[in-house]
UniProtKB/Swiss-Prot annotation:
Region annotated 2 X 6 AA repeats of R-R-R-R-S-S, chain positions: 5-24
Record PTM text: Phosphorylated.
Subunit structure of this chain's protein: Interacts with protein AC132.
Biased composition (Basic residues): 18-41
Annotated gene: P6.9
Species whose genome carries this gene: Autographa californica nuclear polyhedrosis virus (AcMNPV)
Name of protein: DNA-binding protein
């Protein structure tokens, strides 16, 4: 079923890509990842945001 996999919501984001990113990035434990990059970016407002990417 292609419709279930590529379900486009009203916001314009695809349901499939959101699930794939969540399972590969957030569910993986930072204990022993294959290769992960953690970038710390500070916006002009002063908010600190951490972004961890797993490969």
């Amino acid at each position: 079923m292609v419709y279930r996999r590529r379900r486009r919501s009203s916001t314009g984001t695809t349901y499939g890509s959101t699930r794939r990113r969540r399972s590969s990035g957030y569910r993986r434990r930072p204990g022993r990842p294959r290769t992960y990059r953690r970038s710390r970016s500070r916006s002009s407002t002063g908010r600190r945001s951490y972004r961890t990417r797993y490969y």
